[in-house]
Design a protein with these regions (language model features):
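Proteins enriched for Cys/Gly/acidic motifs involved in redox and nucleic-acid/cofactor modification
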Residues: 1-205, 218, 248, 263, ...
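Terminal RNA-binding accessory module
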Residues: 349-448
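Conserved SAM/AdoMet-binding glycine-rich loop
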Residues: 77-78, 86-87, 91, 189-316
Length: 448
């Protein structure tokens, strides 16, 4: 096969960690002589990296298999990722799927390609028990974005009652600080301006760094070392558990030239009763304390929140506890997830199932609240001159970028601005929810 199959296409579903891992798999194939092409182009190999968090994992997987088959009916389709680990046999039955690789095998894709042929029936499965996945494979994305996702940690030892991620990714384990720094320097040398630190539970960094369960280092050790790396304009922390976000880490970010003032902190519920049912490792008092600590030392920081609606036992009263808690918190935006039942999780057997229409109603209420929070936060940034990193896409003659504190801005497309950081004055909020900008010099003249 190696003489005939020379093009490969990739599609990623889900989180930033998946993007980092897809990029690593893509580099393995390109290093072996494959040319990378668009997913809608005719390719010899299609790799789909799946997610298990969204309730539509099965439908999305089938949709992208069909896309691949439409582009090239003779192309080989390989499925990897969290959904592939959880449901390998089901995926192998999808028409068009030729190979399913579990968590342990996804980075060994090349070893399977030479003998792989287009399946007339079901795909070949190479999976494993998740307990066998106890090693760390470093990954980072590069080449297709103005920012790189750098994987520093994988797996999770928490037992949240709604979550399948430990079943899909295994125990908590970390890259070594030396390797993280090496990867960060490689990214910086490629003129990528922003690195996003990713993992399943990055606040748990250091566990399993050298193949054991002890913490050799901490998350604070990691970010302290990264803070010294030359050539990285921005480092963003993707998401960190509130109980693992320590004062020292917040203080370091507040004084750093590289780490940006942006935190994404999962909450999941503003009800202590539900947090206990979810087996989260904090209550609302600690969460409230973390948010206000950030605000005290970084008044302009963006603070994002994950929240789940419709968890079993979430009465109207308990939902309103969440709503009111979030409404009072000085946060910047929400990511709202509607609870969906997952096999092999504790929550599946819980009493107090919330009807689907009620889940959707609560989701809508929190999405409206999120928009209000975001607009209020953006309003506080108008009139300020902030650094903007411009992205590469040209959307109807416009280009978009983000400030350090995650305000999304736009201007007329200029090729020279792509992947550049420009200091610009934030003018006004536009109808699409982005912010218009003008150069700080133009702003100075307008006020003169």
């Amino acid at each position: 096969m190696s003489h005939f199959h020379r093009t490969a296409a990739f599609h990623t579903l889900g989180c930033k960690l998946n993007f980092a891992e897809t990029s690593t798999i893509a580099r393995q194939l390109t290093d072996a002589g494959y040319d990378k092409v668009s997913f809608d182009d005719r390719a010899d190999i299609y790799v789909i990296n799946t997610c298990s968090v969204t309730e539509n994992a099965d439908r999305e997987c089938k949709l992208h298999v069909k896309r691949a088959m439409k582009a090239n009916p003779e192309g080989l389709v390989v499925i990897v990722g969290c959904y592939a680990q959880l449901k390998p046999e089901e995926i192998s039955q999808i028409a068009g799927v030729d190979l399913v690789l579990g968590a342990k095998e996804k980075f060994n894709i090349l070893s399977y390609l030479d003998d792989l042929e287009k399946s007339e029936s079901e795909g070949v499965v190479h999976s494993c028990e998740i307990e066998e996945t106890d090693f760390f494979i470093g990954s980072y994305s590069i080449g297709d974005r103005t920012r790189a996702f750098l994987k520093v940690q994988d797996g999770c030892d928490y037992k949240c009652t709604y979550c399948t991620i430990p079943l899909a990714r295994g125990i908590s384990r970390s890259d070594t600080i030396e390797n993280v720094l090496k990867n960060a320097r490689e990214i910086a040398e490629r003129d990528i301006k922003e690195i996003v630190l990713t993992g399943v539970n990055i606040g748990d960094y250091g566990k399993g760094e050298f193949g054991n369960k002890r913490h050799e280092h901490t998350f604070l050790d990691l970010i302290s070392e990264l803070n010294q790396v030359e050539g990285i304009e921005r480092i963003r922390i993707s998401s960190i558990e509130p109980n693992l976000l320590k004062d020292e880490s917040i203080e370091l970010v507040s004084k750093s030239k590289s780490f940006v003032p942006h935190f994404h902190i999962p909450l999941q519920s503003g009800s202590d009763e539900l947090l206990k049912k979810m087996k989260r490792r904090y209550l609302t008092k600690l969460y409230n304390d973390r948010v206000h600590k950030i605000r005290d030392v970084m008044p302009d920081a963006a603070i994002g929140v994950d929240v789940i609606v419709g968890f079993p036992g979430e009465t109207e009263e308990l939902f309103m506890e969440t709503y009111n808690f979030l409404n009072e918190l000085p946060i910047s935006y929400l990511h709202v997830f509607t609870y969906s039942e997952r096999e092999n999780t504790e929550a599946v057997g819980m009493q107090g199932v919330v009807p689907i229409p009620e889940r959707k109603k609560r989701n809508k209420m929190l999405r409206i609240l999120s928009e209000k929070k975001k607009m209020a936060f953006y309003q506080t940034q108008l009139g300020k001159t902030l650094p903007v990193l411009w992205e590469h896409e040209n959307k109807d003659g416009k280009m978009y970028g983000f400030t350090e504190n995650y305000v999304r801005v736009q201007k007329d497309f200029e090729q020279a601005s792509v992947n550049q950081i420009e200091f610009l004055n934030l003018e006004k909020i536009l109808s699409d929810g982005t912010v218009s900008v003008q150069s700080s010099y133009e702003s100075f003249l307008a006020k003169a």
